[in-house]
UniProtKB/Swiss-Prot annotation:
Family named by the database record: Belongs to the tRNA pseudouridine synthase TruA family.
Key words of the record: Isomerase, tRNA processing
Reaction(s) catalysed (UniProt annotation): uridine(38/39/40) in tRNA = pseudouridine(38/39/40) in tRNA
Gene source species: Methanothermobacter thermautotrophicus (strain ATCC 29096 / DSM 1053 / JCM 10044 / NBRC 100330 / Delta H)
Binding site for substrate: Y109
GO biological process: tRNA pseudouridine synthesis
InterPro entries, per database record: PsdUridine_synth_cat_dom_sf (IPR020103), PsdUridine_synth_TruA (IPR001406), PsdUridine_synth_TruA_a/b_dom (IPR020097), PsdUridine_synth_TruA_C (IPR020095), TruA/RsuA/RluB/E/F_N (IPR020094)
Stated name of the protein: tRNA pseudouridine synthase A
Function: Formation of pseudouridine at positions 38, 39 and 40 in the anticodon stem and loop of transfer RNAs.
Keyword DNA repair in record: no
EC number: 5.4.99.12
Record: active site: D56
Length: 275
């Protein structure tokens, strides 16, 4: 019996999060169907199937992990053939029994914003510095979370083309925590908060409501573990997933162009014919 780890990528748009839920499609549910269909596992409990990251509905991933025990050989293409196109196993590894997929040393999330001229990335970076270290993130989570203390290793903000990239690194995260952190940074950029106000939202009993940013812009980029994992990457899986992403990018770009044309036309009508 071997312990196996799979590195999984997915587009979260069509799923109600990663974790299994009754009567709705989830990434974990589709993955288990494929593993059972391929004869790799028969029962998740007997296989001691575990997941690393429970991403929310609409959140995407390029490096989530699962682990399980099996006596069967692993053929990535066999698993991927039974998965929807928007879920891919990118790599696998045989790991030691003590390996615990649920406890990575670091999780890397990336949130992508469309850059507006009014956005002040310098103030955002100044505010983001307050997140580093160990803090009580109660204002960035649900009130029902029993232990809101988390450690953030780093927050990096960069501009790439028309995008602002916010990379957040930490051991673990609360529900909606990253999306609420980004909301606070955006409020700083828009002048609703000062950079130093961020300190007042941390380690405090004063409760402030922060609307989480949309999940569709969030990606779980990767997980790092304390033990070295010899991942066997599948080149064909990479090519197929890249191809799908490029197809979807083209579709969304064309949809954006159509909406822009409609908006421009209505503005023209408003200016010249609705006097």
């Amino acid at each position: 019996m071997r312990k196996i780890a799979l590195k999984v990528a997915y587009i979260g748009t069509n799923y109600h999060g990663f974790q299994r839920q009754p009567d709705v499609p989830t990434v974990e549910g589709k993955l288990l169907e494929a593993l059972e269909g391929a004869g790799i596992i028969e029962d998740p409990k007997r296989a001691r199937f575990q997941i690393a990251g429970r991403t929310d509905r609409g959140v995407h991933a390029l490096g989530n992990f699962v682990s399980f025990f099996t006596e069967e050989d692993i053929h990535v293409n066999q698993i991927n053939d039974l998965l929807p196109r928007d879920i891919r196993v990118l790599a696998w590894a045989s790991v030691m029994y003590p390996f615990k997929v649920r406890y990575p040393l670091e999780r890397h999330y990336r949130y992508i914003l469309h850059r507006e001229e009014s956005m002040d990335t310098y103030s955002m970076a100044e505010a983001a510095a307050h997140f580093r270290g160990t803090h009580d993130f109660s204002n960035f989570s649900r009130r029902s979370d029993r232990d809101p203390v988390r450690r953030i290793n780093d927050v990096r903000i960069s501009e790439v083309g028309d995008s602002i990239i916010i990379d957040v690194y930490g051991e673990s995260f609360l529900w909606q925590m990253v999306r609420k952190m980004v909301r606070a940074l955006l409020m700083v950029s828009e002048g609703e908060l000062a950079p130093d106000d961020m300190a007042g939202l941390l380690d405090t009993d004063r409760r402030v409501f922060l609307e989480p940013m949309p999940p569709e812009n969030l990606i779980l980029m990767d997980l790092k573990y304390g033990v070295k994992i010899k991942l066997r990457h599948d080149e064909y899986a990479f090519k197929r997933f890249i191809s799908l992403l490029e197809e979807e990018f083209k579709v969304y770009r064309e949809m954006s162009m159509v909406r822009r044309a409609m908006s421009d036309h209505l503005r023209d009508l408003q200016e010249h014919e609705l006097d």
